[in-house]
Every structure is written in structure tokens, then in C-alpha cells.
Amino acid sequence: SRRFGSDKALISFAGMKLIEYIYRNLDQNFKKVIVVGSKAEYSFLKGAEIREDIFQNKGPLAGIYTGLYFSKSRYNFICGCDMPFLNSQYFNFLKEEIRIHPKKEIIVPRYNNYLEPLAAIYQQSLLTKIKDEILNDNLKIKSFYNNSSKKVISEELLKRNFDLEKLSKKIGRLVDKKELQNLLMKTYLIRKGEEYGINE
């Protein structure tokens, strides 16, 4: 999606673009990362597996489908390009939820009384259900949820484990580009400090 007059995934800070920062973060926490988007636009992501939507112009639901289609994993974490504040603690938390609820097709967090479908776990077995929704032009991102088994992670549980306000912050909710770049830079520096054993 677009904001600040351009694709928000391409906003730059710390010598990299937002999508590159998110990709590196995911690549450090998962065995394989698939980027769904334009190969030409994201060609700077060296070593990344980039796949273009199988169903064009069908929105985020088509992105979920494409990611699952090219994945070889039973369980898949899917996120948007506008949530750079997800971290390894959250990823490990979701992996533990998979261990506890291995049969659930969807493991999704709830925040502010809404499910967050682009920070969730999806089983590859959902492919047929999602494809049917796309072919029927039911393009709401959660169109297949009612016919799928899911574990909803309560907001209370999330709050006990995370700084939920920051974790759930989306780029699209920030109005000022400079504010966004400053926030991203701060997060980047904190993570670099943690990597080298340096505290704030």
C-alpha cells in the first residue's frame, strides 16, 4: 500500500529501506522468508526469494495465498510490510503457540478488539479455502476465517508478554514521515545495541 506519496515499504532509514529491515528481521528468525511483491521493485533484496501475486489486483488475501503456495512449510508466519516492530520475542511466542495448538489452522492475535491477520500463523492446508474465496471475489482478508479452525491470542495474554502498543504499531497509522524515520532509527539502534551487548 502507499503512503507519504510512495510505497511505504520503500521508505529509507539507516541506509536501508523499510522492506529490507523487515526482511532482515524475519531472515534472522525463520529458516526461509518469501517476499510477495514486484521482483523489479524489490530487486535490491539480495538473496531474497521474491514471488509476484498469483492472482493480480486481489489485495492482501492474494498475498497470503501466494506466500502459502510457494512455501514448503506446514506452518507459516505472515506479516505485512508496515509492521517493523515485531521482534524475536514475539516470533518465539507464536512458535510456542504452534507447539501448544498444533492442529489449529490459524493462530492470530487480537488487539483493540480486532484480529490482526497480518501478524499471524497460517497452515499451508488453508490454500484451497483461500483460493475459493479469491475466485468468488470475496477478498476480505479474513473471508476464510469462519470456515477454519483458529486459536485467537487474547489481548490480555499479549499485554502480559509484550509492550503491545509498540509491537502492534503500523506504519500506516503514523502521519509524519520524519516521525516514522526517527522511530525506525531508534528501534534499529536498540536492536544493534542488544546484538552487541550494549544497553540503552
In which residue ranges do the predicted regions lie?
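Nucleotide and nucleotide-moiety/phosphate-recognizing core
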Residues: 1-138, 143-164, 191
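Glycine-rich phosphate/pyrophosphate-binding loop and the adjoining helix
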Residues: 157-193
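Acidic/polar hotspots within intrinsically disordered regions
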Residues: 196-199
